[in-house]
Amino acid sequence: MTNLSVNINKVATIRNARGGNMPNVLKVAQDCELFGAQGITVHPRPDERHIRYSDVYGLKPLIRTEFNIEGYPCDKFIDLVLKVKPTQVTLVPDAPDAITSNSGWNVKDNFDYLSELVDTFTSQGIRTSIFVGTDLANIELAAKTGTDRIELYTEPYATYYPEDRDKAIAPFVEAAQLAKNLGLGVNAGHDLNLENLAFFNKNIPWLEEVSIGHALICDALYHGLQETIALYKACLNS
């Protein structure tokens, strides 16, 4: 079964909009686990405009499921990950001012750098995942870095799903199959939601994990957090 990792960045965004500690990011993470999430994801950025580095340190002793820290591997991020030692680190090629992730790595141009990072994190017992698109040559190179997994950037799938879901999913199935053949675990994330998640998961039954934040928090405004997590898990069990 595919694990649901809840990205709690948007919870931190709401907190930071007003100051103070409401909602309490640490409690929300614990409640997500209580309600059935199999993981918690955070994406700290250098300006700490949502998740703060202090949040990450605070979350570490509380998380009882899998803890995934994703982000651009600047020196500050690398130091954070090595100190916290999460279950998984997901390497994302974000510019510091990016509103959200908008592409996967060009592994060819960053091969030596990514290989070095993978070796550094692996030596500390941290599972590694590289954020990529569906380019097959890119995935083959990702496997050669020694990474444990890739995370497929699913925004193109979500964009074209309403027009032609079979056409939208096709490159992702091909990419995920190649990754599986190369011995890589496959994660996915970005713009997955209650409308498109079940079809994605059905077509890639070996999917290990989806990381979902923005859509899930939006749905929770209507359904409540507990019911929303149940709805997303139902998509992954269908």
From Swiss-Prot:
PANTHER family referenced in this protein's UniProt entry, alphabetically: PYRIDOXINE 5'-PHOSPHATE SYNTHASE
Domain of life of the organism encoding this protein: Bacteria
CDD domains per record: PNPsynthase
Binding site for 3-amino-2-oxopropyl phosphate: N7, R18, D191, G213, H214
Subunit (UniProt): Homooctamer; tetramer of dimers.
Family indicated by similarity: Belongs to the PNP synthase family.
UniProt-listed Pfam families: PdxJ (PF03740)
Catalysed reaction, written as an equation: 3-amino-2-oxopropyl phosphate + 1-deoxy-D-xylulose 5-phosphate = pyridoxine 5'-phosphate + phosphate + 2 H2O + H(+)
Binding site for 1-deoxy-D-xylulose 5-phosphate: R45, H50, T100
Cellular localisation: Cytoplasm
Organism of provenance: Parabacteroides distasonis (strain ATCC 8503 / DSM 20701 / CIP 104284 / JCM 5825 / NCTC 11152)
GO biological process terms, semicolon-separated: pyridoxine biosynthetic process
Gene encoding the protein: pdxJ
GO molecular function, one term: pyridoxine 5'-phosphate synthase activity
Database matches in NCBIfam families: pdxJ, PRK05265.1-3, PRK05265.1-4
Active site annotation, chain numbering: H43, E70, H190
Listed pathway(s): Cofactor biosynthesis; pyridoxine 5'-phosphate biosynthesis; pyridoxine 5'-phosphate from D-erythrose 4-phosphate: step 5/5
Disulfide bridge positions per record: none
Protein name: Pyridoxine 5'-phosphate synthase
Keyword Chaperone: no
